[in-house]
Curated annotation (Swiss-Prot):
GO terms for biological process: acylglycerol homeostasis; cholesterol efflux; cholesterol metabolic process; lipoprotein metabolic process; phospholipid efflux. The lineage of its organism: Eukaryota, Metazoa, Chordata, Craniata, Vertebrata. Participates in the reverse transport of cholesterol from tissues to the liver for excretion by promoting cholesterol efflux from tissues and by acting as a cofactor for the lecithin cholesterol acyltransferase (LCAT). Pfam families: Apolipoprotein. Residues 246-258 have a biased composition (Polar residues). It is found in: Secreted. InterPro entries: ApoA_E, Apolipoprotein_A1/A4/E. This is Apolipoprotein A-I. Residues 1-18 form the signal peptide. Major protein of plasma HDL, also found in chylomicrons. Expressed in liver, intestine and muscle.
């Protein structure tokens, strides 16, 4: 791909000298300016397209330098064109000459494009060829590595599966064995706790009876003190007895006749 960089450099150098100005022909100044600007624009466009085909990883620095050179060339052409003194508008023969030069420039651009197209195709073909070669070299190694890891995993699984099953069976047996050894300890602790609880109940029984008697005595005393108050309350707030009416008194009076 370095030949492409060299070709672009030669193309830029040739483009800058394709149309030398004639100082002794001021009548052709506008014609030369137009032709030069158009040619430089076409050269820059074609060169930029060719630069874009270069690989960014390998030719990144060259691409930046060439792009900067193209920009500098365009700026130089613009500044030079603006610095030239103005001239009268060209006549009809001058316009014909400009059209002829424009046609020649377009022809040169098409020729360059035609010449670069096969080179670009060849470059693409070479790159694809190299990539295929790399893939053919690396693909067996990658497959071998994958198969090796798969084989190692299968072998490891074949070794660990029986161990896992054995451990599962041992865990079940060990749980029963542990339970057998643990139950006597649990029974001893439970018996000791039961014994201590009975001792506490025996020790607390007299105190409970005494507390019960004191509670009954206190309740009786409270009841004796509250009973007079209750009777007095009933006497104070009880409704007065009903007096019999006159009709009822006459009806209940004994008759005078025998």
């Amino acid at each position: 791909m370095k030949f492409l960089v060299l070709a672009l450099t030669i193309l830029l150098a040739a483009g800058t000298q394709a149309f030398p100005m004639q100082a002794d022909a001021p009548s052709q100044l506008e014609h030369v300016k137009a032709a030069l600007n158009m040619y430089i624009a076409q050269v820059k466009l074609t060169a930029q397209r060719s630069i874009d085909l270069l690989d960014d990883t390998e030719y990144k620095e060259y691409k930046m330098q060439l792009s900067q050179s193209l920009d500098n060339l365009q700026q130089f052409a613009d500044s030079t064109s603006k610095s030239w003194p103005p001239t009268p508008r060209s006549s009809a023969p001058s316009c014909d000459a400009t059209a002829t030069v424009r046609a020649e420039v377009m022809k040169d651009v098409e020729d360059v494009r035609t010449q670069l197209e096969p080179k670009r195709a060849e470059l693409t073909e070479v790159l694809n060829k190299h990539i295929d070669e790399y893939r053919k070299k690396l693909e067996p190694l990658i497959k071998q590595h994958i198969e090796l890891r798969r084989t190692e995993m299968d072998a490891f699984r074949a070794k660990i599966d029986p161990v896992v099953e054995e451990m599962r069976a041992k865990v079940a047996v060990n749980v029963e064995e542990t339970k057998t050894k643990l139950m006597p300890i649990v029974e001893i602790v439970r018996a000791k706790l039961t014994e201590r609880l009975e001792e506490l109940r025996t020790l607390a029984a007299p105190y409970a009876e005494e507390y019960k008697e004191q509670m009954f005595k206190a309740v009786g005393e409270v009841r004796e003190k509250v009973a007079p108050l209750s009777e007095d309350f009933k006497a104070r707030w009880a409704p007065p007895p009903r007096r019999p009416s006159k009709s009822s008194w006459l009806s209940t009076r004994p008759s005078a006749r025998p």
